[in-house]
Amino acid sequence: MKIGLISPYDWAHPGGVNTHIRCLSDQFRSMGHRTTIVAPASKPVAELDTDNLVVIGKPIPVPMAGSVARITLSVHRARRVKSLLEDEEFDVVHIHEPLLPVLPLAALRFSRSLNVGTFHAYLRRNRGYRALRPILKNWIRNLHGKIAVSEPAAGIVARYYPGYYNIIPNGIDLAHFSADVPPFEKYNDGKINILFVGRMEKRKGLQYLLAAYSRIKWEFPQVRLLIVGPGKLDAASERILGERLLEDVEFLGQVPYDDLPRYYRTADIFCSPATGGESFGIVLLEAMAAGTPVIASDIPGYATVIEDGAHGVLVPPKDDAALANALVEMIRRPDTRRDLGQRGRAYAQAFSWDLVARRVMDYYEQLLQERDPLRRLQKT
């Protein structure tokens, strides 16, 4: 099968959607299929370590839902997408975030292949979906199949564009995150390491973790907070750091992908206090795959991944007192940390990329058979 995978996002900046696409592509190729990834990029192809990548357009940073999306807005690139689709004649065109400009919408408009769209985002209010509904409702009919990575993600888009959405979650590279790698020796000094991984964006809730940390640091001086992720601190987090003179807080910035498993293994507790805007909890699964117990906000996207008390601990969002209490309970009870880590690691096995990719491929086959009854007869 010949498959085109369309991303709206800058391929030079790793993120959840691009990682999803790369892993799907790798799995499909291991099954014997041919894949082509189409995305904008801010770097030359030769620097991007993706041998099946076609770059269309230069991305620019666009504020979006409390984050920054690096997408191309040049409508002239639509003609290049049209030409590529005509030349390649894909069996399947899989469009990620199919209602975003410019590449996904161009693929949605011009593709004559079987078109599948995956909706990744969770936004409580999507002004773009609402404002452009009179136009997009006609284009979305060009999708023969729709996937959402979680029920919350499906619920948001279905509010504006009703229909069936096949729930197929994000996957995780278990071989990478479950690897038996050593923790970082410099942090193996008897302190309790609390880890945060995420962009320095307000919606990631770091300010609430810093506030919770300030509540427990004086009772438990042996705790340390490790913060991994790119970006600049928001004003609220800066204020907490300045006013409370917090000790043993290390900002590590963006770290190499290959080092992430070691940070998870170094951590005694992983904490993700996001306030919303999460359709799924990839970082939660990464931590669980590494055997690290998780404390996270009880928001829709995270609650689809964690059952409170079974695979981790959920606390009310934006509640630093509740977060501090959960941290204290875990700090005091090493047996709870161990048990949650073991259960989380076992649970994460269900999200392996080979299983997720197989589900996506089965969906392709189902849609192809519905579109072409002769294909069903040929398979039987």
Go through the PLM ranges and name each one:
Residues 254-255, 262-267:
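Short alpha-helical donor nucleotide-sugar binding micro-motif in glycosyltransferases
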Residues 265-279, 292:
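Acidic donor-binding loop of glycosyltransferase active sites
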